[in-house]
């Protein structure tokens, strides 16, 4: 059993495309089948290698590995010509010489008459030998198919056009190439966005004209943005790699994409194995799904919190390099990540907090310094107690802070806040006892002294 993902390389891998790829990938895994990647690059003017690279990068980051491909339609032009020749020889296609001007007049006349705009078959019986090639669509009968998601769909052939299958420059069009490719690649289930549903009856007629077995069709509901408009490449932050750059885990994005139109009870978080086990195409909603950035962020935070340190480190490395953060031998980076995973919503946040454990600073936040470093007495007392500690552990550090509070008869905050600022430079240090332990005694005392001397 095979499914496929067939993007056009005219831009990055975006949210809608990634969800289509995910559902096709999951379907293939569930069927113990194969997932095929095909690059539909017949639009020679708009297709480009940079977009191909972006699509492959996005799929690699998401972990959507393909079993076959990537196949490129531009490598298969001879095959398409062979099929077109067959259709021409069998009078199931014909050459058309109608000019753009004639077609424009026809278009305007049909609109004036309140009729559906479609080609009138002017060249159908002329037996021409040149021009664009049109498919000789049946004039009578119905095209009926059962969409796995949307149910039975019926279209009268009178509503369909004699579509162009070869352009004037000799390049094949989408509706021809997709039929030939899905047949040759033995695709059993065509999973794609519902913006393709109007093409399906045309493609079914092509299948039947060629005497080929029909695959199943499953058209996914559209994804709406927060303003209710259809999510598209023109909306901000829809590129998959934008989410990598913003610090989202790939499994968080995959989990969220799976829930855009599909659900299993009230369960919010799934492993990929669970998605494969529980997923059913027929369970996908027909109604559009809404993309909610806040929900994705919430999900990312949950998955960071429950992820393994090893997985977080694998994904964090890119962000550390991106922020020019060098990890030295001490403190142990695994221990730092284990502490931070309970605090951070994104890996960008985590990388920012990792910095204070490995990179020294020579200034303090000016506003916080005016507030917390006016009276150096608490820090001087704390420095003395911490310097005397023989065992540098969080519990002992916390106890030293409490002792200073007791001896000076001040609140915990009067010691804790200056200490937090001293450790981090910006006051964003979380649990000061744990941070101080991880930073290490020498570095913690050095930063305390700098705060006292400031």
Swiss-Prot record:
Cofactor(s), names only, from the UniProt record: Zn(2+)
Location of this chain's protein in the cell: Cytoplasm
Provenance organism: Ruthia magnifica subsp. Calyptogena magnifica
Primary site of residence: cytoplasm
Motif stretch ('HIGH' region): 7-17
Family: Belongs to the class-I aminoacyl-tRNA synthetase family. Glutamate--tRNA ligase type 1 subfamily.
InterPro entries per UniProt: aa-tRNA-synth_I_cd-bd, aa-tRNA-synth_I_codon-bd_sub2, aa-tRNA-synth_I_CS, aa_tRNA-synth_I_cd-bd_sf, Glu-tRNA-ligase_bac/mito, Glu/Gln-tRNA-synth, Glu/Gln-tRNA-synth_Ib_cat-dom, GluQ/Sye
Key words of the record: Aminoacyl-tRNA synthetase, ATP-binding, Cytoplasm, Ligase, Metal-binding, Nucleotide-binding, Protein biosynthesis, Zinc
Cofactor note: Binds 1 zinc ion per subunit.
UniProt-recorded Gene Ontology molecular function terms: ATP binding; glutamate-tRNA ligase activity; tRNA binding; zinc ion binding
Domain of life: Bacteria
Catalytic reaction annotation: tRNA(Glu) + L-glutamate + ATP = L-glutamyl-tRNA(Glu) + AMP + diphosphate
EC number per UniProt: 6.1.1.17
Function of the protein: Catalyzes the attachment of glutamate to tRNA(Glu) in a two-step reaction: glutamate is first activated by ATP to form Glu-AMP and then transferred to the acceptor end of tRNA(Glu).
PANTHER family cross-referenced by the UniProt entry: GLUTAMATE--TRNA LIGASE, GLUTAMATE--TRNA LIGASE, MITOCHONDRIAL-RELATED
Cellular component, GO annotation: cytosol
Pfam families referenced in this protein's UniProt entry, alphabetically: Anticodon_2, tRNA-synt_1c
Signal peptide: none
Subunit description: Monomer.
Residue numbers covered by motif 'KMSKS' region: 230-234
Protein name stated in the entry: Glutamate--tRNA ligase
């Amino acid at each position: 059993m095979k499914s496929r993902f067939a993007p056009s390389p005219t831009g990055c891998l975006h949210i809608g495309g990634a969800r289509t790829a995910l559902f096709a990938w999951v379907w293939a895994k569930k069927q113990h089948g194969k997932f095929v990647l095909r690059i539909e690059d017949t639009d020679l003017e708009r297709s480009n290698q940079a977009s191909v690279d972006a699509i492959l990068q996005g799929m690699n980051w998401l972990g959507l590995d393909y079993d076959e491909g990537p196949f490129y339609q531009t490598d298969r032009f001879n095959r398409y010509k062979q099929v077109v020749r067959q259709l021409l020889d069998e009078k199931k296609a014909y050459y058309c010489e109608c000019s753009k001007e004639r077609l424009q007049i026809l278009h305007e006349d049909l609109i004036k008459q309140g009729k559906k705009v479609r080609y009138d078959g002017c060249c159908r019986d002329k037996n021409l030998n040149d021009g664009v090639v049109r498919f000789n669509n049946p004039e009578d009968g119905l095209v009926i198919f059962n969409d796995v998601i949307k149910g039975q769909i019926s279209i009268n052939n009178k509503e369909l056009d004699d579509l162009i299958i070869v352009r004037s420059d000799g390049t094949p069009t989408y509706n021809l190439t997709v039929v030939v490719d899905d047949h040759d690649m033995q695709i059993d289930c065509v999973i794609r966005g519902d913006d393709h549903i109007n093409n399906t009856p045309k493609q079914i007629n092509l299948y039947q004209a060629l005497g080929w077995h029909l695959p199943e069709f499953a058209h996914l509901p559209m994804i709406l943005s927060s303003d209710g408009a259809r999510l598209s490449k023109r909306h901000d932050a829809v590129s998959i790699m934008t989410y990598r750059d913003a610090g989202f885990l790939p499994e968080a994005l995959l989990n969220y994409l799976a829930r855009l139109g599909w659900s299993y009870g009230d369960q919010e978080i799934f492993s990929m194995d669970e998605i494969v086990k529980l997923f059913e195409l027929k369970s996908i909603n027909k109604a559009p799904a809404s993309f909610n950035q806040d929900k994705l962020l919430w999900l990312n935070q949950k998955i960071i919190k429950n992820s393994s340190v090893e997985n977080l480190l694998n994904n964090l490395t890119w962000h550390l390099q991106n922020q020019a953060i060098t990890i030295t031998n001490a403190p142990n980076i695994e221990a730092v990540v284990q502490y931070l995973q309970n605090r951070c919503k994104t890996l960008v946040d985590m990388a920012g907090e990792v910095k204070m454990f490995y990179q020294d600073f020579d200034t303090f936040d000016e506003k916080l310094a005016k507030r917390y470093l006016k009276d150096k007495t608490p820090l001087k007392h704390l420095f003395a107690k911490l310097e005397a500690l023989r065992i540098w552990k969080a519990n002992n550090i916390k106890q030293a802070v409490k002792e200073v509070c007791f001896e000076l008869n001040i609140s915990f905050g009067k010691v804790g806040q200056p200490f937090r600022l001293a450790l981090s430079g910006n006051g964003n240090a979380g649990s000061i006892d744990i941070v101080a332990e991880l930073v290490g005694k020498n570095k913690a005392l050095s930063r305390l002294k700098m705060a006292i001397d400031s």
